[in-house]
Amino acid sequence: MTDVAPPAGVLDVPTDSVGVVTPQRMHFSEPLQLRNGSQIADYDLMVETYGTLNAARTNAVLVCHALNASHHVAGIAADNPRDIGWWDNMVGPGKPLDTNRFFVIGVNNLGSCFGSTGPMSTNPSTGAPYGALFPVVTVEDWVNAQARVADIFGIQQFAAVMGGSLGGMQALAWSLMYPERLRHCIVVASTPKLSAQNIAFNEVARSSILSDPDFHGGNYYAHNVKPKRGLRVARMIGHITYLSDEDMAEKFGRSLKAEDIRFSFDVEFQVESYLRYQGDKFAEYFDANTYLLITRALDYFDPALAHGGDLTRAMAQTQAGFLVVSFTTDWRFAPNRSREIVKALLDNKRPVSYAEIDAPHGHDAFLLDDARYHNLMRAYYDRIAEEIGA
């Protein structure tokens, strides 16, 4: 929820910021049926909102997060003035997703480590953290949980459900699981399923965690340690896939950390230093069990599987209008993966707009400032606002 006064240490809140925000914790006592056949009961979801829900409850937009993000989509966290929302350049007054017009909701998914119930939470059956006992969750499970959040707000239909990367998969799942509950589906830098190569990257990352001596079968909390070495390597692997070769060449090239080579196995190149820094930073704040869960959810997502692998048949049940966006240098989820979604929609004669943005920053481009990209998003949301009278 948005406050009006800046927190201590923040002298100036930008006029296009949603301001200082404090999340709310929603508790759900009714069991949630999971895709794996089990249930989870008495769980919490962290939720953050921006803007005002109109009387008709038609101006709500759900923003779904990617692997290491959370409910904190925009604004300044009340408990940490340096914590700016992960999509702050997209969401706010006068921004592409304009909170003067739309009521924006961010939900932290089950299994995460940012306040929603996950492996770090207390298992009511044991009184200890769930750890490895936390059930494997899927994109579909997250969407079902998000639908319960919508119910609490009295939202029958979202003006849009939007996400990038893994968030885009959730948006896509919304269009299939609750086709009548969203007017528009915005899928950015995403894919209808992971390729074998992407599953392989995830497996190497998970293996680095599982082989860390401090992992203790996922119950490292009881040992008061974290498998930081494995998590560090996992993040380094993932980070490489988020950047383009062009971007890495421009940022680092073959620049050395010292003036000359030292003929050692310590850090020699600037790119090595960068990756180690990113890995170290990630290992300090992220949870290894959560990393395992979320990467496995990525692997499992494949809406065409129930339709004999035919994405066109899978997409036949959609009712929303679509905006699909890809980036030329994204090799994690390359443009051809977005075009698969577009083709399936066109085959079903569904309304879809598609843009392939020429950007040098690889997969991470969906999070960065780019005038063409943001103008496109702004224009699409202007259209939605006109439809609903926002």
From Swiss-Prot:
This protein's pathway: Amino-acid biosynthesis; L-methionine biosynthesis via de novo pathway; O-succinyl-L-homoserine from L-homoserine: step 1/1
Keyword Transferase applies: yes
Pfam families membership: Abhydrolase_1
Glycoprotein is among the record's keywords: no
GO molecular function terms noted in the UniProt entry: homoserine O-acetyltransferase activity; homoserine O-succinyltransferase activity
NCBIfam families: homoserO_Ac_trn (TIGR01392), PRK00175.1 (NF001209)
Family: Belongs to the AB hydrolase superfamily. MetX family.
Protein name as catalogued: Homoserine O-succinyltransferase
Organism: Cupriavidus metallidurans (strain ATCC 43123 / DSM 2839 / NBRC 102507 / CH34) (Ralstonia metallidurans)
